[in-house]
UniProtKB/Swiss-Prot annotation:
Cellular location(s): Cytoplasm
Binding site for AMP: 215-216, 220, 239, 313, 344
UniProt name for this protein: Phosphoglycerate kinase 2
Function comment: Essential for sperm motility and male fertility but is not required for the completion of spermatogenesis.
Modified residues (N-acetylserine): 2
Amino acid sequence: MSLSKKLTLDKLDVRGKRVIMRVDFNVPMKKNQITNNQRIKASIPSIKYCLDNGAKAVVLMSHLGRPDGVPMPDKYSLQPVAAELKSLLGKDVLFLKDCVGAEVENACANPAPGSVILLENLRFHVEEEGKGQDPSGKKIKAEPDKIEGFRASLSKLGDVYVNDAFGTAHRAHSSMVGVNLPHKASGFLMKKELDYFAKALENPVRPFLAILGGAKVADKIQLIKNMLDKVNEMIIGGGMAYTFLKVLNNMEIGASLFDEEGAKIVKDIMTKAQKNGVRITFPVDFVTADKFDENAQVGKATVASGIPPGWMGLDCGPESNKNHAQVVAQARLIVWNGPLGVFEWDAFAKGTKALMDEIVKATSKGCITIIGGGDTATCCAKWNTEDKVSHVSTGGGASLELLEGKILPGVEALSNM
């Protein structure tokens, strides 16, 4: 699957056409009020481009929350999003109370030129995800012919299809892969994601550094193995470093995280790194705690001293930070996925914050820096560095699967150039 050869919105003829666009309006809500409109704001350039280039209408579809295939308009309706969209676009948005069916098809058949239409939550229908559960908790499964009907109805709502929902690209849901139109393009958000991941995965400048943090080795095996085929350098930190250090250095790790499953493949990983000539940097010192608590008593340890029984490592220490700074300074391309410590708590945030500062510095000197979604993106928001790195991915699961070398169904479904 080539990321850089997919049809993009700027190459799509939208004049006089109805554009059906899959967006990600899965925004946080409190009592039907949107608490963060970032995802809605992010979709505006793609919507505006269609309108400015003479599209007859833009029909928007999205999911919100996890209604599991059951209509829950009181809890998960997209209606509040229509109001927010209206204020951001400065024009009326027609909200429809469903996303498929005869009424919706009629409303979208011949809309007034320049219309913006928002459909109700896709996941009110079990046919979107293929499975769900009813209010009693019983599992429900969509019937194949109903899935086909659902997809056929969505396909009637537009003449061309645009997908701007990278965060859901790793899911083979109906709205991601089932709209049957001849031209299927990525929107500008999706395009930016694909452009940056193509830079890392298809044609990397070197030296290329991957920084991998997070808790469990087992969760990151596929990621580590795939990246070892691509990179020159790797930093392994976070909770999973303790498993490596215990296996490789026989380090005493006290009550730190230890991953039994992951421990079995540590030696394989090191053999592969050696074979590929990849240098892996591990932490050499640690900030420790006497319990997993924000206000725990804080101590310090090194690989040589070990971590005493009952204590746990929750961050890397100053020597590790110096080592990381040296490795980062040499790189021309960096992909970072996973924090180096419990960054949510100030006492254990220094390692991740020090690394972030070095990444920002490297970016200002021309290094390409890509932050995988999820917790690492949260770090960027916390320290206000989103515009000080090259790219912060909007998709945690989707970016992880790309870096693992998997094919994303939502990207594969797009037309090739």
